[in-house]
Amino acid sequence: MIPFLNRAVNFSKRTALISNGKSFTYQDLIDQSDMVASNLLNSKKDLKEARVAFIVPPSFEYTAIQWGIWKAGGIAVPLCVLHPLPSLRYVLEDTQSETLIIHPDYWELLEPIFKELALDFIPLTNILKPFRKAILPDIDLSRRAMILYTSGTTSKPKGVVTTHANIE
């Protein structure tokens, strides 16, 4: 397990974040991110740094998805909810994302690329559904955790890779 995620257990009853006027504890975040990880893994043992993109507004779900991707061994690729379709397509193609988790508010925006890109498109509601808890892989701090995109002042945006050690 990733050390900072392990530390969340020590604060399980404390408020982790407030989203849409509702408080969520670290335990809520642990439980929901375990569910996300289990759904992503399905019958696999480790995502082995597969890129998992997600387009979700800032919320409890955003954090649970990001943590769940990490717990499953994937690389989180957060997409900006304000970007137009061509920019989103560019990031998905550039990162070679295998999966895209989509909040219902962005389904219509992304629908035109469903047939064009070889991605597993997962509605947010599906990834948050209860699933048998998987045995989560051990994640070394040297593994890649996230790809964030810069604003691209000289051309197209550039992906910046962050490891778990960088986040720690």
Task: Annotate each predicted stretch with a short phrase.
Residues 3-25, 43:
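AMP-dependent adenylate-forming
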Residues 56, 79-80, 102-103, 118-128:
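Short beta-strand elements of ligand-binding domains
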Residues 30-38, 160-168:
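Conserved structural elements of the adenylate-forming
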Residues 47, 94-96, 117:
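Active-site charged/polar residues at nucleotide-handling catalytic sites that mediate phosphoryl
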Residues 22, 37-83:
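Conserved AMP-binding/adenylate-forming
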Residues 52, 69, 100, 144, ...:
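Conserved S/T- and glycine-rich ATP-binding loop of Class I adenylate-forming
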Residues 131-149, 155-156, 166:
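Conserved pre-ATP/AMP-binding loop-to-beta segment of ANL
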Residues 81-112, 130-131:
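Conserved ATP-dependent adenylate/AMP-binding module captured primarily in the ANL superfamily
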